[in-house]
């Protein structure tokens, strides 16, 4: 075979290798994911026509708490987005999932490595009369390239699983955000309820104090007995204890809100408001509609799909890894000759 024929052979082989790689890439192993279904009757005796799922309820808004019309609650909810540590952790986990997905996707592309080395050696003389050989320098540069052919779909399945984990992490972030806002709203309304309770208990304490004073005056005048005074004192002590319990409960809710907004409880305070609790208009809905607002359900379903994709990656690991690789290198005794 002449020299020109040998040079032409690689150019003819490369298209064939590329075509074979594309054909073999379709041999992805592992089961295809099928979303789980739940057996349901054809009709329910309590309901008539079916309603298609359409989660367009205003209550699903990202700022659902504004329906209560409370400016203090709105300001606290805005601080949750900035300072809540649970949200920061969920966001970091989402960024981690994105980075891992990018790393899995990088396996589609070839990898390149470069090496460099330098040695200096000297050979001792074999006889006493012979002089020592001068030291010899050696410089080398090398490069390697490799590309794994995804014959069995291992890389494809890993990328699919990583992308599904990103979707699950995104749903986890939405669940963490919903949980933080809902917990803050619950604690805030409990605090406002404690304010109202404390207001009525303080009024009751003032009334019992007046009643005790009147009873003591009646006792001094000989109109009431000692038992009436003792009963009035007992009622006053009970009212004061209830008022103290309401104050302690309010402090606990205030401290919980401080933690949710990322502040130290010692330096955080919410002014008491003697006003009725706001009531939002809650739309009439179905339990199935409420499930559409559950991001944790979406996260669980995405993890099932990711586990299904991981089955294919595990099955592909049983087969040999096929790839293409090439390497080249140079060695010179003079560094200037190597880099020019």
Positions of predicted regions on the chain:
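Regulatory alphaC helix of protein kinase catalytic domains
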Residues: 49-79
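Gram-negative bacterial Sec-dependent N-terminal signal peptides
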Residues: 2-27
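Short, polar/flexible loop-turn hinges at active-site or ligand-entry regions and domain interfaces
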Residues: 151-160
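Periplasmic alpha-helical coiled-coil/stalk elements that build and connect Gram-negative outer-membrane
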Residues: 3, 155, 171-286
């Amino acid at each position: 075979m002449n020299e020109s024929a040998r040079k032409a052979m690689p150019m003819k082989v490369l298209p064939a290798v590329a075509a074979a790689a594309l054909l073999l890439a379709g041999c992805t192993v592992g089961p295809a994911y099928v979303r789980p279904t739940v057996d349901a009757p054809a009709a329910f005796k309590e309901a008539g026509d079916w309603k298609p799922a359409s989660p367009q309820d205003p209550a699903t808004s990202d700022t659902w708490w504004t329906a209560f019309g409370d400016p203090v609650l709105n300001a606290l909810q805005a601080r949750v987005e900035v300072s809540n540590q649970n949200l920061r952790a969920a966001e970091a986990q989402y960024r981690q999932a994105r980075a891992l997905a990018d790393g899995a996707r990088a396996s589609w592309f070839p990898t390149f490595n470069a090496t460099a080395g330098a040695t200096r050696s000297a050979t001792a003389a074999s006889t006493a009369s012979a002089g020592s050989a001068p030291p010899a320098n050696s410089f080398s540069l090398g490069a390697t390239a490799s590309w794994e052919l995804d014959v069995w779909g291992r890389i494809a399945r890993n990328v699919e699983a990583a992308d599904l984990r990103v979707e699950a992490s995104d749903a986890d972030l939405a669940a963490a955000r919903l949980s933080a806002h809902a917990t803050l709203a619950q604690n805030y309304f409990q605090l406002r309820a404690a304010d109202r309770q404390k207001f009525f208990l303080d009024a009751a304490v003032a009334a019992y104090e007046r009643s005790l004073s009147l009873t003591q005056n009646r006792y001094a005048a000989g109109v009431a007995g000692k038992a009436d005074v003792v009963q009035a004192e007992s009622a006053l002590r009970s009212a004061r204890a209830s008022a103290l319990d309401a104050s302690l409960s309010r402090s606990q809710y205030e401290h919980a809100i401080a933690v949710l907004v990322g502040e130290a409880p010692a330096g955080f305070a919410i002014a008491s408001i003697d006003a009725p609790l706001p009531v939002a208009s809650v739309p009439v809905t179905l339990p199935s509609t409420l499930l559409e607002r559950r991001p944790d359900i979406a996260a669980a379903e995405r993890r099932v799909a990711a586990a299904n994709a991981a089955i294919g990656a595990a099955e592909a690991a049983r087969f040999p890894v096929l790839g293409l690789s090439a390497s080249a290198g140079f060695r010179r005794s003079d560094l200037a000759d190597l880099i020019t």
